[in-house]
Amino acid sequence: MNLISIPAFQDNYIWVLSENNGRCIIVDPGEAAPVLAAIEENQWQPEAILLTHHHQDHVGGVKQLREKFPSIVVYGPAETQDKGVTQVLGDGDRLSILGHDFSIFSTPGHTLGHICYYSEPYLFCGDTMFSGGCGRLFEGTAEQMYQSFMKINALPEETLICCAHEYTLANMKFALSILPDDRDINDYYHKVNELRAKKQKTLPVTLKNERRINLFLRVNDIDLIDKINQETNLQHSVARFAWLRSKKDDF
């Protein structure tokens, strides 16, 4: 399959998996116009829409796409039932689209009903994990988001993280504010800064990369623990994760 990202709004990406014959899967279409333009340009035939959660910038284009393509199947978690979903999915479900198998797992935190879709090597993780960061806790808890991160971290290192926002540069600036002397973080920050200066995308990224530069996956690293302990003494991984999320909220 071919992976394409369609920019939307200020910093969203709408992901599309397409076959050489033009049939395709659309992930989190927050608005219809750029998707319809890409469909026309590439002569795609949409087969399915995958929704990760209920926020408008991820579901806003569903109604218009269903009107244009009445046979399209829309998958999503229970929290998206009023957003045009035709088949509700939950943790542990599996589906096959265009001959490709997808595993669905629950990743609460950003919202309570958030789900991710994994079809090797692609992970469509919505607003759970970003390159260098994690989603805001609008509905869930730090404990829930930490456990969601652990689910993602259990995937193969070559997994491609297809998140829904271009937040990488801001996330790396935050990471540098926490660990300014970390070589991996510095190297990646400079790489990302160069890409964004050229208006190039930083996504997708491998899980292997995230394990090196994403502080939310490194809450048990001694360097980060030492940094946190300069301000407070937190003994548990979840507490350190929550500390990081709070710091990022205020950054």
Curated annotation (Swiss-Prot):
Record: residues binding Zn(2+) 2: 57-58, 127, 165
Reaction catalysis annotation: an S-(2-hydroxyacyl)glutathione + H2O = a 2-hydroxy carboxylate + glutathione + H(+)
Pfam family, one: HAGH_C
GO term, biological process aspect, one: methylglyoxal catabolic process to D-lactate via S-lactoyl-glutathione
Residues where Zn(2+) 1 binds: 53, 55, 110, 127
Cofactor: Zn(2+)
Source domain of life: Bacteria
GO molecular function: hydroxyacylglutathione hydrolase activity; metal ion binding
Annotated signal peptide: none
Alphabetized InterPro entries for the sequence: Clx_II_MBL, Glyoxalase_II_hydrolase, HAGH_C, Hydroxyacylglutathione_Hdrlase, Metallo-B-lactamas, RibonucZ/Hydroxyglut_hydro
EC number(s) on file: 3.1.2.6
Keywords: Hydrolase, Metal-binding, Zinc
Cofactor binding notes: Binds 2 Zn(2+) ions per subunit.
Pathway listed: Secondary metabolite metabolism; methylglyoxal degradation; (R)-lactate from methylglyoxal: step 2/2
HAMAP family, per database record: Glyoxalase_2 (MF_01374)
Assembly description: Monomer.
Function per UniProt: Thiolesterase that catalyzes the hydrolysis of S-D-lactoyl-glutathione to form glutathione and D-lactic acid.
Family classification: Belongs to the metallo-beta-lactamase superfamily. Glyoxalase II family.
Protein name: Hydroxyacylglutathione hydrolase
Source organism of this protein record: Klebsiella pneumoniae (strain 342)
Lineage: Bacteria, Pseudomonadati, Pseudomonadota, Gammaproteobacteria, Enterobacterales
